[in-house]
Amino acid sequence: MGCWGRNRGRLLCMLLLTFMFMVLEVVVSRVTASLAMLSDSFHMLSDVLALVVALVAERFARRTHATQKNTFGWIRAEVMGALVNAIFLTGLCFAILLEAVERFIEPHEMQQPLVVLSVGVAGLLVNVLGLCLFHHHSGEGQGAGHGHSHGHGHGHLAKGARKAGRAGVEAGAPPGRAPDQEETNTLVANTSNSNGLKADQAEPEKLRSDDPVDVQVNGNLIQESDNLEAEDNRAGQLNMRGVFLHVLGDALGSVIVVVNALVFYFNWKGCTEDDFCTNPCFPDPCKSSVEIINSTQAPMRDAGPCWVLYLDPTLCIIMVCILLYTTYPLLKESALILLQTVPKQIDIKHLVKELRDVDGVEEVHELHVWQLAGSRIIATAHIKCEDPASYMQVAKTIKDVFHNHGIHATTIQPEFASVGSKSSVLPCELACRTQCALKQCCGTRPQVHSGKDAEKAPTVSISCLELSENLEKKARRTKAEGSLPAVVIEIKNVPNKQPESSL
């Protein structure tokens, strides 16, 4: 609640200041005919929308409890808010870029630069205040690596296993380690796991009530109040970074307004109503009447210098480049999280190799690693083992492998080799039905016969034991026999002869 309260207060304060200043810029831009300030007011409007999105995302992200329709809660609301903010800012950059190109084609002269300067300084002060409020979110990325960035507590942590509500075993992290080592995550639901095994009672000091405990329900991590603030802060970094980038863009816009107003005020010599001059920076002179051009009462002069008029669009293009450079990482990161790609710090090939090197593991398939939000990385895998007796020890080793890669929420689906089966022949013991085989699971494709083969192939139901025996015999055949023929099961229909009856 502390982190949410601070973020909410900062967002509300910045929202009020931004909205008030946006109204002020719209009024001043109309009075001074300053298109630069009008574009900056539109930037402020986008910031108002961004702050509203951030507030809504922060509000929804507090609802971490699982529901029947949303088993992970609303933990990804802030990631979605970060993506929306990045898209708003990117669209704004292209709008400013188009306006800057138009300014190069048709330069505009600023009216009342002192008023524009005053409003620009006030806007800069407002944005400096916003940068002070959100500067902690300026450079903190998500999932930057493993180590002390998991949001889990130090000290003694209780062992336990999550109560399985579906097929598979939810593996937690290893027991608590020393403070100088990696932090751990425990998945505690009750005192027994899905196999009815009691929790370790040998070290009762690990179950102290003052120790930080993490509880995972339906894949949603729920922490005690000691660690909730730190984890929520990390989970909302993308959203708050989006707000920071908007405030930074406003600050750059205010700097551009101030610099442009100062340069224009001290360097531009424009034409006034009582002055006789021409403006070579425009296609037509600013005083185009014949009386002024033919007048000999005062010498003619030129307005300028013209480079002052091109300073504003040049600075706008520089601002667009800076904003795009700072927004692209946020846009890319939030989009990749929502696309459930493998986090960049996870080497999936090395992870698969380590899992296959574990003693007792025959095959690893259907491995999926993705990032929920912040530092919460989730993995699921099908692990084929030799026998059920050694599975628990294998699961603990697999859990340690995942933990070493920074993955603390893992779901393992165990598979045990059938009698006489080989891993190379049957890579998946729990293959899907033919309806879903092409979509997910082990990707097994049913054999499809075409042409005359389809007519000759009879539909026969055989047991799994018979199928394994046939496959074993098939694998033992030598290469001298040529191509391996398909297993043909012939069914001969012997007609039942009726016994002849004699009278």
From Swiss-Prot:
This is Proton-coupled zinc antiporter SLC30A1. One of its GO terms (biological process) is intracellular zinc ion homeostasis. The lineage of its organism: Eukaryota, Metazoa, Chordata, Craniata, Vertebrata. It is found in: Cell membrane; Basolateral cell membrane; Cytoplasmic vesicle membrane; Cytoplasm. The chain crosses the membrane at residues 11-31, 36-56, 79-99, 114-134, 244-264, 304-324. InterPro entries: Cation_efflux (IPR002524), Cation_efflux_CTD_sf (IPR036837), Cation_efflux_TMD_sf (IPR027469). It is a multi-pass membrane protein. Homodimer. Interacts with TMEM163. Interacts and forms a complex with TMC6 and TMC8; the interaction regulates zinc transport into the ER. It comes from the Eukaryota. Its main location: membrane. One of its GO terms (cellular component) is basolateral plasma membrane. The modification Phosphoserine is found at S502. The gene is Slc30a1. SUPFAM superfamilies: Cation efflux protein cytoplasmic domain-like, Cation efflux protein transmembrane domain-like.
